[in-house]
Amino acid sequence: MVENLEKPIGVSYKNSPSMSKRTAIRMKKSSRFSILLYSVLSTLLAIANPLLTYFANGLQTQNLYTGLMMTKGQIPYSDVFATGGFLYYVTIALSYLLGSSIWLLIVQFIAYYVSGIYFYKLVYYVAQSEIVSIGMTLIFYIMNIVLGFGGMYPIQWALPFMLISLWFLIKFCVDNIVDEAFIFYGILAAFSLFIDPQTLIFWLCSFVLLTATNIKQKQSLRGFYQFLCVVFGMILIAYTVGYFMFNLQIISSYIDKAIFYPFTYFARTNHSFLLSLAIQIVVLLGSGCLFGLWDFIQNRKKASYQIGLNFIACIFIIYAIMAIFSRDFNLYHFLPALPFGLLLTSNKITILYQKVIDRRSHRRQYFSGKSLIVDLFVKKTYYLPLLLVSLSIGLLVYNTYQNVTLSKERRDISHYLTTKIDRDGKIYVWDKVASIYSQTRLKSA
């Protein structure tokens, strides 16, 4: 039987279901199992897995080393340069206190699974289709591996809080939930900001959306009360975390390096600007997100929920611009923009899927279900995702080859340093990765 699809929110329609019904989503057990399976497979590819250590890039090794040094009394931001959130490094440090970084696989799995569940819900709200939702969720996981192979990036741990909050905003606009629930919203905001300060863009755009919604509905006082609830929720977390940061005397360093630095210095390396720009544009095109953004721009005036779609598009554009001008060859810079771009793309994929079903429902199809969604996604984006996959594999092979080639030298240097320097000594190493630091477990000078 052909799945009965309703038209997506990006296109105006009269006989729409009640919005409260659109948010009353009951996931099938098969969909939950699929997301669980995707999360497990993605987690097994994390660099916290000892078998994949050689695949770690400079940022991943630096993050693990920063967490390790917290167990040695060396504090991020003041003693070690760091741009991730305080709770992010604390979590890594706790894993080392428990004996191994392998404990981080549990954190990575939870992040993947919760992100997958709420990404599915968001797509289902747009598509009102089980097949489109699970198909786009599969693409979401594939792109997470392609762009952020090895995981362990702060944005991947903060993403569950962002997607839960986005779902919260949708339910607020649709179901008119109680204002006190914004305390929970504030808690989510605080956790995400202390894991990855880059999420500040999402929260600022959310504030604009809520303000615009309340002004449009002439509920300014109610909006102010909601704001107070958000602040109260944030204080519950910020006060606790801030207490430890204050005792460590790193609040000013944290604001400077974790908050101001990422938004004032887009260039992360001194690589060729034109070459890095070309690579990041390939990422933008290959992710399929530009396909969704272009469709949104073309049908913007027809959109049923312009404010909500504008909100998602705005966040995507800001994060995409930051990635394009990162002046770096690594692909992980596009991770913050990925879910928002795919949400825009899912709108167009839903329409194309409905056309295919309507045209071919009387014939037996070679593709069905998730494979049909992936097939539509790849073909309608002119096979550019395959180019992105090839680029990702090529960069991974190149970086791994370099790491393996230099691994013996790094091990020899690490062995020499551990025999010549006491445990409290400090070293300075000029290298692209922090492997020597991690292997010696010595503090950085």
Per-segment meaning from a language model:
Residues 148-158:
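Short acidic/glycine- and proline-prone juxtamembrane loop motifs at membrane-interface regions
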Residues 402-445:
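Short periplasmic/luminal acceptor-recognition loop of GT-C membrane glycosyltransferases, typified by
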